Amino acid sequence: MAQAHIRGSPCPLLPPGRMSWPHGALLLLWLFSPPLRAGGGGVAVTSAAGGGSPPATSCPAACSCSNQASRVICTRRELAEVPASIPVNTRYLNLQENSIQVIRTDTFKHLRHLEILQLSKNLVRKIEVGAFNGLPSLNTLELFDNRLTTVPTQAFEYLSKLRELWLRNNPIESIPSYAFNRVPSLRRLDLGELKRLEYISEAAFEGLVNLRYLNLGMCNLKDIPNLTALVRLEELELSGNRLDLIRPGSFQGLTSLRKLWLMHAQVATIERNAFDDLKSLEELNLSHNNLMSLPHDLFTPLHRLERVHLNHNPWHCNCDVLWLSWWLKETVPSNTTCCARCHAPAGLKGRYIGELDQSHFTCYAPVIVEPPTDLNVTEGMAAELKCRTGTSMTSVNWLTPNGTLMTHGSYRVRISVLHDGTLNFTNVTVQDTGQYTCMVTNSAGNTTASATLNVSAVDPVAAGGPGGGGPGGGGGAGGAGGYTYFTTVTVETLETQPGEEAQQPRGTEKEPPGPTTDGAWGGGRPDAAAPASASTTAPAPRSSRPTEKAFTVPITDVTENALKDLDDVMKTTKIIIGCFVAITFMAAVMLVAFYKLRKQHQLHKHHGPTRTVEIINVEDELPAASAVSVAAAAAVAGGAGVGGDSHLALPALERDHLNHHHYVAAAFKAHYGGNPGGGCGAKGPGLNSIHEPLLFKSGSKENVQETQI
């Protein structure tokens, strides 16, 4: 046996007879220390896991320990700091009623097994970031009755198993957004008695999807904060506040709530449908408030409600509480005296509400102040059918064309009953067409009023047009009292007469966006209800010119169409600008080319063969007879040159001389101005008289030819 234990020993074996004294001592120590061998004490091993802190073998001097140091109590020791020698295997630590002011970072880092930490009734005013590091097993954290002014959101990091957080009775002034989103595992949150609380953010409770209990009692609340994120909340404490009015939607999203406490909350009025969201409510406490009556059938949607506390309220027993008496008789038939007593009138004072019946009162059916009216709309639009009474103590339900009874809180995708009794359509369809009946009920009976909803299909060609599209048209948007959300756009087209200058068109007139009555189009029903006419508005005036054309466009499409038209205009403008630039560039190129061609042509003409005219003495070329003839002809030409056309009588010359006659005449005219009306004598005075015969020699410099004159 000894040999077996030696094999399990961490000490190496030595040959028999050579075992030294220290090794024998270690062997004896190991054999006679079962706790160490089995790891039962585990102090040395656990201290290593605790971050290297010295092993805690005993309870701190200022505390008392039990259950092998797993439960440590240090209450009423006037401690200013958290003791540093708390055993590492502590699961429960109570530090209440001391003078601790600051919880420093990593104070509890070595207490990895701690489950409950109580720091209540101290002077804690500051909790440093990371103060609760190293507490992965912490389940409950109590910080009530301290001096915290803010919620220590950052300190809750890494508390992945925290289930309960107590912050009651601290001078906290505000609860910011996402104050507890670092501890989504919370099940119970106590924020009661925050008497200096002034502000709760709309997103203060975001992330608390597992919360089951919330205490907001005695926090001086004037309104119920946003609790929509608490989808699993089962118990809600709102007692001790100043909630004068409970509105519809105050408990939106709390479909799992089972218990609601509103004692001593100064509640004076609970509006119709205020509790409709509490489908799972089982217990409701409204005692010690200022309630005088409740809306008709307030508790009807609460199918699971079993216990209602209504005592200590100044109930005014009249027709408005008669329904409550009937409800109490049905809910608690064995004890109708459990809940409330009449405070007025004097004849019924002290009577239990559950004992009242209709014989005590003279009641009348409700009056509908604003009945619904017929409505004509186009498919896809929103619509409302109003049904209002003079008091909120009644209940309002709607009967649809297919026989469905619509109440407040009834789930429909597009249709709902608002808290004021209005039947709201978010997006009407053709199938919604039919007669809708409003039923207003109180203890004496009910009153009904009906209206017809006409839904016309959208015209695929002229989408948004009101049926006929003009006054008097019988389109789907007609009908007195029906509101269609259309806007009228008047477009003027001007025709220019021949000879008249076209004038600039006037600006387009628009009717301001908003509901316009269909009755103005003249297509409404003649038997429409009178109240509708009082709430109608006339359409914008339009010009009577025959060139004006009116188009009706839904305002829901104005923005989208305007943007689309703007894009088209921009594209067209860019195309026009591009074409203009291209044409300008081409014109410039053509102009430059034309200029260059013209310049080249002028240069070519300037450098062409030079023509010369040479006047020579005829005597050197012709015989005497010919010279005389030429002289005579010249004399005749000199006499007739002033009056008429000049003619040069040329003698009979040789054939080669006559071939150049026309050319000489043309050159002569070009040189002297080519005036057909005047003779050559007027242009050239040198030819008025010919003293000697002359010859013109014309031609190029290379070949000068002769012409006899």
Curated annotation (Swiss-Prot):
Disulfide bonds: C387-C438
LRRNT domain mapped to chain residues: 50-88
Keyword Hydrolase tagged: no
SMART domains: IG (SM00409), IGc2 (SM00408), LRR_TYP (SM00369), LRRCT (SM00082), LRRNT (SM00013)
Modifications after synthesis and translation: N-glycosylated. O-glycosylated; contains sialic acid.
Signal peptide segment: 1-38
Region (Disordered): 496-552
GO molecular-function terms, A-Z: signaling receptor binding
Domain of life: Eukaryota
TM region positions: 575-595
Gene3D superfamilies assigned: Immunoglobulins, Ribonuclease Inhibitor
Functional description taken from the UniProt entry: Synaptic adhesion protein. Regulates the formation of excitatory synapses. The trans-synaptic adhesion between LRRC4B and PTPRF regulates the formation of excitatory synapses in a bidirectional manner.
Name of this chain's protein: Leucine-rich repeat-containing protein 4B
Record organism: Mus musculus
Source taxonomy: Eukaryota, Metazoa, Chordata, Craniata, Vertebrata
